């Protein structure tokens, strides 16, 4: 199993950071609805509650081409815990390297009005041979891409800097 953590400081209150990461669905939005982002897409199958708990999605994202999947992967994900302006936790199953990921982002508003966002994810390939051969490199690519996506998105809330 591999894990990855990143902490960002965002020059915005937690409420604004949350709004950027969890925009409400438009009233007339069909289900499923698709959101495009740099390097992939997310298809929302169920919106979940007002905090996003229960949200069900599939994601398409990049993986190393040597996995012979055309450089793309797909995950099936559910948000298992969510607290508005605080926390979103998910579980995912993905392919082509059949794996399970669990992760969260947590917001911690600071006294100076900035917000610390902590992103953490664990990744585990089920097949022991594929795990030994590919898990570390695949998770490294996914983690690097997630960092870029977070940095890109968080800039819509305010100036952003990765601090760990």
Question: What function would you assign to each model-found segment?
Answer:
Residues 97-102, 143:
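Amphipathic hydrophobic-ligand
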Residues 11-15, 80-87, 106-118, 161:
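A short, structured loop/turn motif at beta-sheet edges
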Residues 1-9, 56, 74, 87, ...:
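Intrinsic-disorder/low-complexity, polar/charged segments enriched in Ser/Thr/Lys/Arg/Asp/Glu/Gln
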Residues 1-50:
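Hydrophobic ligand-binding cavity/cleft-lining segments
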Residues 6-8, 74-81, 92-94, 102-109, ...:
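Hydrophobic/aromatic beta-strand elements that line small-molecule binding cavities or substrate pockets
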Residues 10-12, 63-65, 96, 107, ...:
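Beta-strand elements of well-folded, non-transmembrane domains
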Residues 28, 39-96, 148-164:
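Glycine-rich portal/gate segments that line the openings of hydrophobic small-molecule binding cavities
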Residues 116, 122-164:
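A conserved amphipathic terminal alpha-helix motif
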